[in-house]
């Protein structure tokens, strides 16, 4: 997904991708009204989600090879970031200055203590969270969204 692909799309509520994408570029989802987002991408660029003022939860599926922590800048409503099997070594420290004491970072139950601490250090050093205890083991609760009925959507436009 190229840089600025959905940037400032004020009516964007849902994005559905069947398979993993190679990249989510700079401000791909910037300033959109989505409240929840599920990401399945290999690379996540800086400011990928910047300015999503309504975003409350974001879920990252496994397979992330590079993630700029600057992707989380300017997310005032964020409550949950779920990391499903992401190695802390693929996270690039970047200044996000979110400093959100109400944010929970969820990692899988089988995450080792060392990985848990490493993830906490990364999010702390990028000033996304205020306390390493905000990184917790748990289960993500975002269900899989079913594929939309494309024919039904097109019929609304007479196609």
List where the protein language model places each region.
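Structural signature of tandem-repeat unit edges
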Residues: 3, 8-23, 32-45, 53-66, ...
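Terminal, low-complexity interaction segments
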Residues: 114-123
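Short, low-complexity, Pro/Ser/Thr/Gly-rich segments in the mature regions of secreted, periplasmic
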Residues: 151-158
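Small/polar residue-rich beta-strand/coil "junction" motifs that cap repeat-based extracellular fibers
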Residues: 94-96
């Amino acid at each position: 997904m190229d840089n600025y692909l959905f940037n400032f799309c004020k009516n964007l509520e849902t994005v559905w991708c069947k398979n993993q994408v190679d990249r989510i570029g700079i401000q791909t989802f910037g300033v959109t009204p989505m409240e929840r987002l599920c990401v399945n991408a290999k690379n996540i660029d800086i400011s990928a989600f910047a300015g999503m003022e309504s975003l409350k939860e974001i879920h990252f599926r496994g397979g992330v090879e590079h993630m700029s922590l600057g992707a989380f800048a300017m997310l005032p409503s964020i409550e949950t970031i779920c990391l499903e099997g992401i190695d802390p070594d693929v996270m690039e420290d970047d200044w996000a200055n979110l400093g959100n004491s109400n944010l929970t970072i969820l990692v899988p139950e089988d995450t080792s203590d060392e990985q848990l601490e490493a993830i906490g250090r990364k999010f702390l050093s990028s000033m996304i969270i205020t306390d390493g205890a905000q990184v917790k083991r748990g289960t993500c609760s975002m269900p899989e969204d079913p594929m939309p009925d494309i024919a039904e959507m097109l019929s609304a436009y007479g196609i």
